[in-house]
């Protein structure tokens, strides 16, 4: 264990020195990526170092209720239904929102009434929620209001990283090259649809129509013909009324993982990996999570050394551009002439052992359990409150 990691573990406020720091692992949530979050949480709960951390697992239902869920309950649920949603649990909990109080509040409900009792003291929260109401700054703001340390990016970085429009604005301001795109607001489509069609035609086909604030490729459609544009827009609008429409780019899809530095040191970038999509027009939800042969993931990517270094440098620039903390995955296109174009940043990437973020760190010498340790240690180094 490094000195910085030891210091991080020792500085958890309120923790009894004779006990291990307690980490609350959060999963589920209200977004369309609820089931993906459960898969991520199962992987983390299997691998987390329980010799170093006490663990409390908290599931959030699709209507936003918080319950204690054991690892065994989660395992049984996913064994019976791989893309499951959480049922209501037996023990409901909430966060205290008074400064200085960090114990979960346990609901004791009976037919005659109920009461709240204090549960476990929480030293850090590991939020494993993907998409809106989890990865977009809303949950991060709640944790800051509750004076709880947490893994990952803060409110502003999470919000920017969830919005495909504003992340591009941040990238451009940092000097990174982004592909051609246009933003379609709700009023644009409702009142001036023909102007939207004209803007898209200027990009040239194919284009990718995307909800601005959704993940796991939900609502994304590749459009090769103008006559298919309207239906793609309506599909995306089911997930978000703000859309980003991007010109198609001919290039290899390359990703790079970023990990924060200890004691405010510079972020670290992994070796990059490559996604080779098979049988799909792009890396969609089915290729990511449903079909075993939907994509081939290669790490490290077979690229010239100078391109690898450029990718790592640009990943750190992108991380800093959104004011990232903890972790992020940066997605790029590398064109046939080795031009590097950033596509997006993901502030809570897929985190199963076969997901690209952990795989890229494993290829860089940091194994899955150690990566989890690093992220929790980084969270414990940060102050409570606004970040």
Residue ranges of predicted features:
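ATP-grasp fold ATP-binding core
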Residues: 171-172, 199-217, 241-254
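Short beta-strand-to-turn element immediately C-terminal to the catalytic PLP-Schiff-base lysine
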Residues: 184, 220-225, 258-261, 335, ...
């Amino acid at each position: 264990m490094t000195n910085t990691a030891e210091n991080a573990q020792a500085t958890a406020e309120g923790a009894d020195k004779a006990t291990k720091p307690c980490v609350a692992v959060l999963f589920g949530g209200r977004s369309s990526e609820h089931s993906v979050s459960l898969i991520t949480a199962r992987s983390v709960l299997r691998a987390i170092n329980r010799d170093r951390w006490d663990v409390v697992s908290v599931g959030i239902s699709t209507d936003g209720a918080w319950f204690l869920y054991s690892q065994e309950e989660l395992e049984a649920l996913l064994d019976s239904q791989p893309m499951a949603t959480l049922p209501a649990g037996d023990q409901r909990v909430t966060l205290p929102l008074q400064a200085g109080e960090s114990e979960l509040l346990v609901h004791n409900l009976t037919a005659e009434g109920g009461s709240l009792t204090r549960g476990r003291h929480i030293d850090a929260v590991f939020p494993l929620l993907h998409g809106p109401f989890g990865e977009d700054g809303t949950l991060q703001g709640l944790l800051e209001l509750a004076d709880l340390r947490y893994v990952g990016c803060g409110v502003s970085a999470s919000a920017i990283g969830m919005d495909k429009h504003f992340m591009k604005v941040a990238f451009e301001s940092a000097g990174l090259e982004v592909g051609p795109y246009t933003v379609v607001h709700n009023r644009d489509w409702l009142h001036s649809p023909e102007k939207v069609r004209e803007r898209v035609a200027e990009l040239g086909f194919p284009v990718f129509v995307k909800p601005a604030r959704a993940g796991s490729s939900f609502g994304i459609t590749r459009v090769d013909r103008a006559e298919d544009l309207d239906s793609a827009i309506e599909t995306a609008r089911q997930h978000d009324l703000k859309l980003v429409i991007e010109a198609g780019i001919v290039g290899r899809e390359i990703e790079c993982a970023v990990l924060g530095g200890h004691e405010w040191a510079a972020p670290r970038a992994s070796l990059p990996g490559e996604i080779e999509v098979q049988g799909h027009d792009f890396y969609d939800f089915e290729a990511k999570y449903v079909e075993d042969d939907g994509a081939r993931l290669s790490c490290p990517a077979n690229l010239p050394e100078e391109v690898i270094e450029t990718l790592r440098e640009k990943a750190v620039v992108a991380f800093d551009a959104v004011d990232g903390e903890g972790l992020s995955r940066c997605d790029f296109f590398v064109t046939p002439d080795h031009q590097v174009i950033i596509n997006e940043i993901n502030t809570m990437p897929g985190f199963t052992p076969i997901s690209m973020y952990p795989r890229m760190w494993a290829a860089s010498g940091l194994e899955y359990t150690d990566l989890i340790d690093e992220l929790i240690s980084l969270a414990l180094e940060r102050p409570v409150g606004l970040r």
